[in-house]
């Protein structure tokens, strides 16, 4: 086995190379990463290496041999597959690692994200929904010193940026969202999809699933005439549906 292949072969299902393939297959079946769209990157906390899904690979068929591995310090590729080129998302993944101290980033072409980007303006908003409690608030508990989640009564806000012809051209707007929304763990790209990050791949996956649930719910609320961020008790005032 070559020194490059050692980086991607492990019997541990939680090894980044194995996890990326497992999750990409799962996300394909969730209809989030079809037609080679989307991608995942995970930072190995033991080595400080970035593992990155390549461009142009069918996500449900991806294997560890298809992955790129990059040194987090030098940003040099330690391993490059012969059949694929680096993902166009790579500069965006690196920005999340460097500016948000992310441990993993998920990019999907979720239809819920795309629809929400057409319905909302500069930001997606939803409030007073239980699932919001799965999303980090960006604040730290003064007693436990642990990160705090949003509460049921909080409003989740996710910035929406305009799509570009090439994904690496999104970098300036992504940096702007880091400044304007310092507590966000996601950004929606209009008519494109969503990027979600977290301190670990487990957290990023939870955030991504919760946000997609909330976006789907917001779409259904919008179809009923209910503003997704409306106050508790105000829902029936907005209903388009006739009373039974």
UniProtKB/Swiss-Prot annotation:
Highest taxon of the lineage: Eukaryota
Cofactor or coenzyme needed: Zn(2+)
Enzyme's top EC category: lyase
Chief location of this protein within or outside the cell: cytoplasm
Record note on cofactor: Binds 1 zinc ion per subunit.
Molecular function terms, GO-annotated: methylthioribulose 1-phosphate dehydratase activity; zinc ion binding
Pathway where this protein functions: Amino-acid biosynthesis; L-methionine biosynthesis via salvage pathway; L-methionine from S-methyl-5-thio-alpha-D-ribose 1-phosphate: step 2/6
UniProt keyword terms in alphabetical order: Amino-acid biosynthesis, Cytoplasm, Lyase, Metal-binding, Methionine biosynthesis, Zinc
Stored SMART domains: Aldolase_II (SM01007)
Binding of Zn(2+), residues: 107, 109, 192
UniProt cross-references to InterPro entries, sorted A to Z: Aldolase_II/adducin_N, Aldolase_II/adducin_N_sf, MethylthioRu-1-P_deHdtase_MtnB, Salvage_MtnB_euk
Annotated EC: 4.2.1.109
Biological processes annotated in GO: L-methionine salvage from methylthioadenosine
Pfam families noted in UniProt: Aldolase_II
Any Gene Ontology CC annotation: cytoplasm
Annotated residues for binding of substrate: 89
Localization in the cell: Cytoplasm
Reaction catalysis annotation: 5-(methylsulfanyl)-D-ribulose 1-phosphate = 5-methylsulfanyl-2,3-dioxopentyl phosphate + H2O
Family as reported in the entry's similarity comment: Belongs to the aldolase class II family. MtnB subfamily.
Protein name: Methylthioribulose-1-phosphate dehydratase
Organism per entry: Saccharomyces cerevisiae (strain JAY291)
């Amino acid at each position: 086995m070559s020194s490059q292949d050692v980086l991607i072969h492990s019997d541990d299902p939680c090894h980044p190379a194995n996890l990326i393939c497992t999750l990409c297959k799962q996300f394909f079946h969730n209809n989030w990463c079809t037609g080679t769209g989307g991608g995942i990157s995970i930072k190995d906390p033991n080595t400080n290496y970035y593992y990155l899904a390549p461009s142009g690979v069918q996500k449900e068929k991806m294997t560890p041999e298809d992955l790129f591995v990059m040194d987090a310090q030098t940003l040099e590729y330690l391993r490059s597959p012969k059949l694929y080129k680096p993902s166009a998302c790579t500069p965006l993944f690196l920005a999340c690692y460097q500016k948000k101290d992310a441990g993993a980033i998920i990019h999907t072409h979720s239809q819920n994200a795309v629809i929400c980007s057409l319905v909302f303006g500069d930001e997606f908003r939803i409030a007073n929904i239980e699932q919001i409690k799965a999303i980090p608030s960006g604040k730290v508990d003064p007693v436990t010193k642990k990160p705090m989640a949003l509460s049921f009564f909080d409003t989740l806000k996710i910035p929406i940026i305009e799509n570009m012809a090439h994904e690496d051209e999104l970098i300036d707007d992504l940096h702007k969202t880091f400044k304007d929304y310092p507590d966000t763990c996601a950004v929606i790209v209009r008519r494109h999809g969503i990027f979600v990050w977290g301190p670990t791949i487990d957290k990023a996956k939870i955030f991504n699933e919760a946000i997609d649930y909330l976006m789907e719910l917001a779409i259904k609320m919008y179809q009923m005439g209910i503003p997704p961020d409306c106050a508790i008790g105000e829902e029936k005032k907005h209903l388009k549906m006739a009373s039974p």
